[in-house]
């Protein structure tokens, strides 16, 4: 909205044309989202407390988590509000990729909202059934993949790109839709599984979103894409604005979510943020780089899969508790130590992912 306004005003005063630069709008989107989060956050959290929208804690979880009972949850609605508003303010709304990102994120947030609401209504930690949750996620993910496939103007936009290996494109054709489904649903649920400690999920999300913004900017610029030998995807640069909004909103949320947390994002935020990261990675053709940079999300998910398979086959558990962050808590690690060490690992993985821009 602001972008369109400034472009109109540019005919009156050429100085307004400075807002056509993606890098400037990316920075402004980050700052806008951060300020909005910090300003709205206290009022939003107060409302959650007023209406007793509090976290339900599992009885079989770490004992230290019992004090979290009743902490305001569904804070992800704040993140969603800020991200979407900021994106609409600073993006080129004539770009269909912007709408795919916004609507997919909003849809996954809505699924998470229903899940959180049912937990509150039932006064336990069980929300939507697994079948209902994955069914709804599948509908949205297939729809998003289908739209992106229809929007693709050349084979590169639906081909698998291998990081660190130059000039390798694996055409997927219509299989791109199925591949996108797994990336979106997998990333969404991986972030959700990671969201079990104060600040644990939001910091890696911010780091990965920032890095994906760089990839999106490069892939949307024909000159940079050619120089760095990455796929050129026309229009993908607008995802830099979306990523800037994710970074700003995430940092603003962290202000209230850092240990000891004043609010939790709930499934409303975790499912939406995971889907948002996935959409940007798909648009920028960097799904495998997302797998690297989001290594913490991947390991957390694998720990759950390993735990379930092991228990069903042998009756024994590999970890003291899954996801993995609870295993370390059960070993006696303080919650902040677990979170910060996972953040450090994410810093390393994000740097590895970014290095793929040059190492080819």
Curated annotation (Swiss-Prot):
It comes from the Bacteria. The chain crosses the membrane at residues 26-46, 70-90, 94-114, 136-156, 164-184, 199-219, 236-256, 263-283, 289-309, 339-359. It is an enzyme of class 2 (transferase). Pathway: Cell wall biogenesis; peptidoglycan biosynthesis. One of its GO terms (cellular component) is plasma membrane. It is found in: Cell inner membrane. Its EC number is 2.7.8.13. GO terms for biological process: cell division; cell wall organization; peptidoglycan biosynthetic process; regulation of cell shape. One of its GO terms (molecular function) is UDP-N-acetylmuramoyl-L-alanyl-D-glutamyl-meso-2,6-diaminopimelyl-D-alanyl-D-alanine:undecaprenyl-phosphate transferase activity. Keywords: Cell cycle, Cell division, Cell inner membrane, Cell membrane, Cell shape, Cell wall biogenesis/degradation, Magnesium, Membrane, Metal-binding, Peptidoglycan synthesis, Transferase, Transmembrane, Transmembrane helix. Its cofactor is Mg(2+). It catalyses: UDP-N-acetyl-alpha-D-muramoyl-L-alanyl-gamma-D-glutamyl-meso-2,6-diaminopimeloyl-D-alanyl-D-alanine + di-trans,octa-cis-undecaprenyl phosphate = di-trans,octa-cis-undecaprenyl diphospho-N-acetyl-alpha-D-muramoyl-L-alanyl-D-glutamyl-meso-2,6-diaminopimeloyl-D-alanyl-D-alanine + UMP. It is a multi-pass membrane protein. The keyword RNA-binding does not apply. Catalyzes the initial step of the lipid cycle reactions in the biosynthesis of the cell wall peptidoglycan: transfers peptidoglycan precursor phospho-MurNAc-pentapeptide from UDP-MurNAc-pentapeptide onto the lipid carrier undecaprenyl phosphate, yielding undecaprenyl-pyrophosphoryl-MurNAc-pentapeptide, known as lipid I. Belongs to the glycosyltransferase 4 family. MraY subfamily. This is Phospho-N-acetylmuramoyl-pentapeptide-transferase.
